[in-house]
Amino acid sequence: MTTTFEPDADWLVYLANPRKPEYVLPRGAVDALLVAGDRARGVATVRPGVSRAELADLHAAGVRGIRFNFVRRLADPKPDDYYLGLTDLVAELGWHIVVYFEAPDLAERWNLFTRLPTPVVVDHMGRPDVTQPVDGPEFALFLRLLTENQNVWSKVSGPERLSKSGPPQYADVVPFGRRLVETFPDRVLWGTDWPHPNMKSHMPDDGALVDVIPRMARTQDLQHRLLVDNPLRLYWEA
C-alpha cells in the first residue's frame, strides 16, 4: 500500500503532523533515489494541491515525471481539468507525464492527451487487445497518437499483462512492440514492471521478459536506443 511522506520526514514528525503532502511516493522509494544520487530516477503521483516546494523536493530526489492512471478498475475517472491543472507546474521542471489507460478508452481521452505540454509516456503500449491484428483499427488509433504528436512516447512493456498466449514467449505481444520500436525508434522505452502489482494470471520470470527485448528490437541499434539513448534523453536531460 502506498502512503504519502515528505521527502525528508521522519516517522515521529510525520505522525504528529496533520498535513499530508499532495504527492504519493513511498518513503523507501525516496530514500533509494537519494542514496542512488544521479544514477536513478523516479515517477510520482501528485494531486492538484501540490506546491512548487514539494515538487522541487521531489526533483532534488530524482523524480522526473508524474503518472495519471485512467484504468477504470484501478482509479476513479476525473475530468480533464483535474489533470490539466497539474501540467504547467510539471512543465516548468522539464518533467514528463506517464499515462496509463486501456485501448478502448483512448478515443475518450484523446483531446486531453494531445493537449499535454510535456513529453507524454504511455504505459504498456496503450494496453492493446493482442487478439486483434496489429494492423487493426484499435492499434491504428494508438499509432496515430504517436504519429501526430511528436511528444508522445510508448513503453514497450507489460507483455505479461497483455498476452493471451502466455509465458515464456509472449508471442502474441511481440508484433505490437516490434511495430512501435521500428516505427518510433527514438520514442520507446522498456521496463520490467517489477514487482508486477495486481497480476492474477501468473508471476512472470523477469529473465523471460528480458528475452522478449531482441524479438521486439531486432538490431543492436534499436536495442541501444530502447535501453540506453532514449531513457538517458528522457530521464537525465530534464
Give residue spans per PLM region:
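Short, electropositive alpha-helical surface patch
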Residues: 23-43, 173-181, 205-215
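Mid-to-C-terminal alpha-helical segments outside catalytic/metal-binding sites
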Residues: 1-11, 179, 185-189, 201-238
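Catalytic pocket-lining loop regions of alpha/beta-barrel enzymes
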Residues: 79-190
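Structural recognition of the beta-strand scaffold that forms the well-ordered cores
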Residues: 13-14, 67, 121, 155
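Alpha-helical packing segments of well-folded alpha/beta enzyme cores
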Residues: 1, 8, 29, 54, ...
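Conserved, mostly hydrophobic/aromatic
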Residues: 29, 58, 66, 90, ...
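An amphipathic alpha-helical core segment
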Residues: 197-199
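Active-site gating/metal-coordination segments in enzymes
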Residues: 19-104, 110-111, 155-167
